[in-house]
Amino acid sequence: MAAKLILFVCATALVAQSVLSIGCGCGGRGYGGLGYGGLGYGGLGGGCGRGFSGGGLPVATASAAPTGLGIASENRYEGTVGVCGNLPFLGTADVAGEFPTAGIGEIDYGCGNGAVGITREGGFGYGAGYGDGYGLGFGGYGGGYGLGNGGYGGCGCGWGY
């Protein structure tokens, strides 16, 4: 029974690691100098930046509801009342209550002054690993990951790190 439990725990850990991990490119097959590392063509996983750098994977985001500035009072305001502040990108402004006929209520709301916004979105793009000829280039067999020095592999960057 204990052997079945240990086998089940190990299989679950293996499945979790293979589902939730990011491939490191070439996977230790000595492709580091051939230039395949930047594109992730090693066969074990895609490059880290290809899924979210403007490729074929659509991304949808939504902002949280704006919270913050609020004024609530049962008092009577006489004279000019001024409230200044900045609201979030998806800001709201609201005045509720009764205004006497002699007074006014006004909200000046503007956006787009250049202080808030998304100025640039850029991805990692496609790496172009440097291949030094037709053989094993620089770092074809480097200090691999998890194997110590002398191990073979790389991280997918084309230099065998």
Curated annotation (Swiss-Prot):
Main function: This protein is one of many from the eggshell of the silk moth.
Renumbered residue ranges of the record's region Left arm: 22-52
Location of the region described as Right arm (Gly-rich tandem repeats) in the Swiss-Prot/TrEMBL record: 122-161
Annotated signal sequence range: 1-21
A GO cellular component entry from the record: egg chorion
Region (Central domain): 53-121
Region of interest: 3 X 5 AA tandem repeats of G-Y-G-G-L: 30-44
Protein name listed in UniProt: Chorion class B protein L12
One of the protein's GO biological processes: chorion-containing eggshell formation
Taxon lineage: Eukaryota, Metazoa, Ecdysozoa, Arthropoda, Hexapoda
Family affiliation: Belongs to the chorion protein family.
Pfam families per record: Chorion_1 (PF01723)
GO function terms (MF aspect): structural constituent of egg chorion
Sequence repeats: 30-34, 35-39, 40-44
Keywords: Repeat, Signal
